[in-house]
Amino acid sequence: MTKKHQAELTAVAEKIYDLAANEIQAYINKTYGKNQENTLAQQLEDFHVIADTAASYLMGNAMAMVDESCWNDDLKTLNTHVRQIATYVASNQQAELGPKS
């Protein structure tokens, strides 16, 4: 994998991470309220670890599957699904957090 391709893939993973983090932040604010700073901080810290792992997993798989001859098509496809992947990551984490007790 070329450095250029690695940089492009990193940019996609960062987009996914940012979108998923925003969705989780909104979910926590709505579900738990903004006044529970300690709980919020801990849950967000946990989420960041999970999101980071998901982004790393995505990167690892994408690097393993990359075919240099169709890189541009693959990158375009991945970019098309960024929102979908972020939503999937976020909804899995929301299930982990569970409803407000």
Tell me the role of every PLM-derived stretch.
Residues 1-101:
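Solvent-exposed interaction surfaces and binding hotspots enriched for charged
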